[in-house]
């Protein structure tokens, strides 16, 4: 007699809910900013790693999970023009350059610290931080009659997200620069401060500075 194949649930362990890093759910995470909502990817994913398959696609990074995008920003050393108080802060963390496993562990540890301090889902706290740190206006230079002027322009949602994540990672590097604070602790503190709109947050204060300069250039 031919054996009947067992149901898939009996042959393999299939979780009822896929959680990011096996700990945090994205089902109840809410994005209030209508312009950022289409670009903040919160798909349930156990391991936020796409192996760079969106790298050569136009606007492909919009499909990358928001946690992975934070990991990618943490992993970078930053360009030569990114300075805080005259120092290249992110140069202190070259051990994370192009080492995604280590960057993944740093972000995971930061999320644990956020959960312990706030008692809330760290992914939701990250979304709040991004919404508060994403500038709406910036300046660009235009030339009229051989004279260059700075004018205010609106920022696209995808760039708003990029700037917010970059400044969060840069602010974390600044906080642990020449201190005993670990990078994970600094990252957790920066995200919490930005989520609370605290002026001590580098990302939030940078957003206010960018918008203030843009307002004066109207």
Curated annotation (Swiss-Prot):
CDD domains: uS7_Eukaryote
Entry coiled-coil feature ranges: none
Biological processes per GO annotation: translation
SUPFAM superfamilies, A to Z: Ribosomal protein S7
Gene Ontology cellular component list: small ribosomal subunit
GO molecular function, one term: rRNA binding
Nuclease keyword on record: no
Keywords of the record: Ribonucleoprotein, Ribosomal protein, RNA-binding, rRNA-binding
Protein family (similarity comment): Belongs to the universal ribosomal protein uS7 family.
Subunit relationships: Part of the 30S ribosomal subunit.
Function: One of the primary rRNA binding proteins, it binds directly to 16S rRNA where it nucleates assembly of the head domain of the 30S subunit. Is located at the subunit interface close to the decoding center.
PANTHER family reported for this sequence: RIBOSOMAL PROTEIN S7
Name of the protein: Small ribosomal subunit protein uS7
Chain's gene name: rps7
């Amino acid at each position: 007699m031919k054996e009947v194949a067992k149901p898939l649930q009996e042959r393999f362990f299939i979780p009822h809910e896929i959680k990011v890093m096996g700990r945090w759910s994205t089902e109840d995470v809410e994005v209030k900013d209508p312009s950022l909502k289409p670009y903040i990817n919160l798909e349930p994913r156990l391991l936020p790693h796409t192996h760079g398959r969106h790298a050569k696609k136009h606007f492909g990074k919009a499909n990358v999970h928001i946690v992975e995008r934070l990991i990618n920003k943490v992993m970078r050393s930053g360009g030569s023009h990114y300075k805080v108080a005259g120092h290249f802060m992110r140069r202190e963390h070259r051990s994370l350059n192009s080492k995604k496993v280590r960057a993944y562990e740093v972000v995971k540890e930061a999320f644990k610290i956020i959960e312990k301090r706030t008692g809330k889902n760290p992914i939701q706290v990250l979304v709040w931080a991004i919404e508060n740190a994403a500038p709406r206006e910036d300046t660009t230079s235009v030339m009229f009659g051989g004279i260059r002027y700075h004018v205010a322009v609106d920022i696209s949602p995808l760039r708003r997200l990029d700037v917010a994540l970059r400044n969060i990672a840069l602010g974390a590097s600044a906080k642990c620069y020449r201190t005993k604070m670990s990078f994970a602790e600094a990252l957790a503190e920066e995200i919490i401060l930005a989520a609370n709109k605290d002026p001590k947050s580098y990302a939030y204060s940078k957003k206010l500075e960018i918008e203030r300069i843009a307002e004066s250039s109207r």
